[in-house]
Swiss-Prot record:
Gene Ontology terms: biological process: cytoplasmic translation
Sequence similarity: Belongs to the universal ribosomal protein uL2 family.
Region (Disordered): 1-24
Organism of this sequence: Solanum lycopersicum (Tomato)
GO molecular function: RNA binding; structural constituent of ribosome
Pfam families: Ribosomal_L2, Ribosomal_L2_C
Keywords: Cytoplasm, Ribonucleoprotein, Ribosomal protein
Name assigned to this protein: Large ribosomal subunit protein uL2
Gene: RPL8
High-level lineage: Eukaryota, Viridiplantae, Streptophyta, Embryophyta, Tracheophyta
Disulfide bonds: none
Signal peptide (UniProt feature, chain positions): none
Length: 260
């Protein structure tokens, strides 16, 4: 009988310890309060820092507590152009400047935003990776919703009270820089999760993978596998509608969809 394969080991149920002990903390907006709903709060960026395991830099923003004599420190995903000492304004009456946080209803159509909330007060969900941004498409004042174009190209309708940061997330173009050597990839994934190096199935022994074994590296059977295949067999092209290169009409249709 074969062994438990890699795809089964990384599934739910096994012991997993997240690599979070060296991270700076969760990056999110301030907790939504009376000050942000009705006016604005002023904060200052004390430092821009690197968070291990995250592509985008983080900005540590210090706010004065609205009621008590103390300061509040928050970690924001840094927008392109943020700098140490910059004042950041959060709230309904904040100005349209890069780094400021406003509700979507206060942001004009066509504006570039990032770290957009999905529900009012969830402190930021969409467009948070390095170089990402979302575009405000339209507002619907009748039902209080806003249509937003996400980095994937999908268009999503969210409540107009959801907050967003003006600008694009810093660190764009990070993935275009070549890794150059295995050591760089080692350090990159060491702070993320155990997913590197990734050995191909055809390079394994037959006991370790359905694609393993043989006198030369080949799968030996169809690489497509049915949707209801059991774990351990479900590797390769799962429930593929088609395989191979796009040719003829299919290629033209795909090219037209990419342009749109």
């Amino acid at each position: 009988m074969g062994r438990v394969i890699r795809a089964q080991r990384k599934g739910a149920g096994s012991v997993f310890k997240s690599h979070t002990h060296h991270r700076k903390g969760p990056a999110r907006f301030r907790t939504l309060d009376f000050g942000e709903r009705n006016g604005y709060l002023k904060g200052v960026i004390t430092e821009v820092i690197h968070d291990p395991g995250r592509g985008a830099p983080l900005a540590r923003v210090t706010f004065r507590h609205p009621f008590r004599y103390k300061h509040q420190k928050e970690l924001f995903v840094a927008a392109e152009g943020m700098y140490t000492g910059q004042f950041v304004y959060c709230g309904k009456k904040a100005t349209l400047m890069v780094g400021n946080v406003l509700p979507l209803r206060s942001i004009p159509e066509g504006a570039v935003v990032c770290n957009v909330e999905h529900k009012v007060g969830d402190r930021g969900v969409f467009a948070r990776c390095s170089g990402d941004y979302a575009i405000v498409i339209s507002h619907n004042p009748d039902n209080g919703t806003t249509r937003v174009k996400l980095p994937s190209g999908a268009k999503k309708i969210v409540p107009s009270g959801c907050r967003a940061m003006i600008g694009q997330v810093a660190g764009g173009g990070r993935t275009e820089k070549p890794m150059l050597k295995a050591g760089n990839a080692y350090h990159k994934y060491r702070v993320k999760r155990n997913c590197w190096p990734k050995v191909r199935g055809v390079a394994m022994n037959p006991v370790e993978h359905p694609h393993g074994g043989g006198n030369h590296q080949h799968i030996g059977h169809a690489s497509t596998v049915r949707r209801d295949a059991p774990p351990g067999q479900k590797v390769g092209l799962i429930a593929a509608r088609r395989t191979g290169r796009l040719r003829g009409q299919a290629r033209a249709t795909a090219a037209k969809a990419d342009k749109a």
